[in-house]
Amino acid sequence: MTQQPKIPRATAKRLPIYFRYLTFLHDAGKERISSSELSEAIKFDAATIRRDFSYFGALGKRGYGYDVKALLDFFANVLDQDSLINVALIGAGNLGQALLNFNFHQSSNMRIAAAFDADEKRTGTILSGVPIYSMEELQEQITAQRINIAILTVPQGVAQEITNQLVETGVKGILNFTPVRVTVPTGVRVQNVDLTNELQTLVYFIENYGSITTGL
């Protein structure tokens, strides 16, 4: 993957959405699309889409719009879709098992390659094709499988401790489903996913603004 320009975090979060919809358009046989058509489909305003795309140079032509195949190929490169990305899942409880069952079915280049849990009843088993290892095997397996991204779905009381272990193994990115805001050193990125917060935010918007669709 070629080096990409620095872009705002909000733009980066929209890139997979663009890629997913462009994949849908390409599979449907559509050859070109305008920013206004794209806006209507994915519910981001056209100005935001044009601004996002402008960070990468001239991706479209005035009066023509965007070539779907060219744009799809471009974002596939930006998102490194040609490389298989192995991900570790830490915590194979209810949420962890749901993620294992899903295992990125909408993405061809990401997969949960290994899961880890402290419960001896779960370790040594295979769930949805993914082996579940003990926590004692964490460093060995992450190193052997060259994993640098982990999903954290553990009890909040051990979230920081396990985060420290992940950092020691060389993990560079953590998708954190726990309510704890874990601390990591420079060079490690954490993305927090708090379902309770998301639902509370949704309720707030519904009660105060109605059911207006909002983008990222």
Curated annotation (Swiss-Prot):
Residues 17-56 bind DNA. Keywords: Cytoplasm, DNA-binding, NAD, Repressor, Transcription, Transcription regulation. NAD(+) binds at G91, A92, G93, N94, L95, G96. GO terms for cellular component: cytoplasm. GO terms for biological process: negative regulation of DNA-templated transcription; response to redox state. It is found in: Cytoplasm. SMART domains: CoA_binding (SM00881). Its main location: cytoplasm. It comes from the Bacteria. GO terms for molecular function: DNA binding; DNA-binding transcription factor activity. Homodimer. Modulates transcription in response to changes in cellular NADH/NAD(+) redox state. Belongs to the transcriptional regulatory Rex family. NCBIfam families: PRK05472.1-3 (NF003989), PRK05472.1-5 (NF003991), PRK05472.2-3 (NF003994), PRK05472.2-4 (NF003995), PRK05472.2-5 (NF003996). This is Redox-sensing transcriptional repressor Rex. It comes from Leuconostoc mesenteroides subsp. mesenteroides (strain ATCC 8293 / DSM 20343 / BCRC 11652 / CCM 1803 / JCM 6124 / NCDO 523 / NBRC 100496 / NCIMB 8023 / NCTC 12954 / NRRL B-1118 / 37Y). The lineage of its organism: Bacteria, Bacillati, Bacillota, Bacilli, Lactobacillales. The gene is rex.
